[in-house]
């Protein structure tokens, strides 16, 4: 967890340190978790055995089975939102349809099952509508204050463009 006291501003050195720590977490924690989900285990990267020895590398993808089964129970029936005010109910229905929230919620749930966390981001799109999407902890992280309440202070998203230029938005 990345923490910054309330009396400190986020400067470039601190942000660089957080990004470096985040990259460490991605390589050593998040990538192995996704590899387990995708059945990419280290045994498959070992050199082949001599031709006269059997080389049976079998993997049971129990991680994927557990994640998919539990998410089917958890979010298999889409979330239903009811409201007494018809105007609010109509807007919430529009938001759900516009952003395909059933799929977003299923993906976010799966992400949380794989990594232990995931992020939902709200934004205003180019048409002026509220957009909702999910972000993986491999590409984003939250910076909290150092209080007992751990209030969010900053959210960082790390992404690449088509030219492989890395950007960080805070």
Task: Annotate the PLM regions.
Residues 119-170:
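Extended, regular secondary-structure scaffolds
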Residues 1-134, 149-150:
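Extended, helix-rich architectural segments
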């Amino acid at each position: 967890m990345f923490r910054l006291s309330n009396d400190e501003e986020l400067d470039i050195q601190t942000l660089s340190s957080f990004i470096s720590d985040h990259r460490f977490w991605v390589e050593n924690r998040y990538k192995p978790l996704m590899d387990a989900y995708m059945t990419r285990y280290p045994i498959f990267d070992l050199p082949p055995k001599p031709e006269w020895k059997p080389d049976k590398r079998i993997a049971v993808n129990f991680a994927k089975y557990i994640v998919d089964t539990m998410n089917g129970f958890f979010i298999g029936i889409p979330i239903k939102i009811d409201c007494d005010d018809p105007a609010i109910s109509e807007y919430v229905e529009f938001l759900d349809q516009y952003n395909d929230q059933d799929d977003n919620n299923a993906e976010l749930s799966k992400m949380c099952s794989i990594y232990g966390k995931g992020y939902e981001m709200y934004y205003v799109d180019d048409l002026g509508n509220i957009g909702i999407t999910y972000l993986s902890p491999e590409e984003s992280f939250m910076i909290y204050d150092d209080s007992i309440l751990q209030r969010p202070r900053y959210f960082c998203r790390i992404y690449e463009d088509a030219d492989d230029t890395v950007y960080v938005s805070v």
